[in-house]
Amino acid sequence: RFLTKITNTKIGTNCEKEVMSKLESKLKLYGFNNLTKTLSFNIYDICYAKTEREQKDYIAYIDEHYNSERLTKILLKVTDMIGAQVLNISKQDYEPQGASVNVLIAEERIDLNFVDSSCNKGKPFFSGDLDSEGETAHEHRTVHAHLDKSHVTVHTFPEYHPDNSISTFRVDIDVSTCGEISPLNTLNYLIDSFDSDIITMDYRIRGFTRDLSGKKFFSDHNITSIQDYIEKDKLRIYDAIDVNVYQSNIFHTKMLIKDIKLQNYLFNQDVYEIAPQERLEITNRLRRSEEHT
């Protein structure tokens, strides 16, 4: 029978140096590290936009602010932080709204002779060179595949409720790595990259590796909670709860911002233009929306 541990507070917080030492302390392995580590990071930004015009303006603002080009820069920073090498970038802005980016990565630099010819190695993003047809070089023949290997993806979902004046912006980020790379040390950067009212994180480890004596290991680093890898200052502004299944190497943390400062949730509107009673009603509506997201 699986044991599930649920906590309302942070479990065993370590300082940043201790966190880094966990990631840097390596087992002596036999052959390739076959562990797959996957971090799913979901954030919700919530806004009060009363009129239909305000709702559409909010969606347009979010859609432009977090377009595929900016998201690509965020993922490239994540790739750099985990010490990986870009093999291929695929990005797209959608109509009427939303964007996605997919970055195929390798654990270390690969000889170009061994990189599949369909991979663009990030050239459409890094290079502005145009071919004879006016397209960015290599962009028109990009193929993105091998999603069972190490990759980083992001998808955005802006939307608004037609009745209760609440608009939301959801971002889904997945960092999946094979080998020695762990995505956990990117958490603080990802939290800072978005206006995060609600954060849901899932981390799991699959497969096994062996040490030099042949003993199996189902994890190559210590972890009791995802919160161990988040800075204390960030944890103070959120209520956090864990649901962890240690035997299966499954870790889940949900964080909800503690204080709602109404001005931060209004779109193109000043809080002092709203009557006190209505302010309270809006605040309660925002809180209910957060709790049911």
Summary of predicted features, one role per range:
Residues 2-290:
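Polybasic/polar functional segments that serve as interface/processing modules
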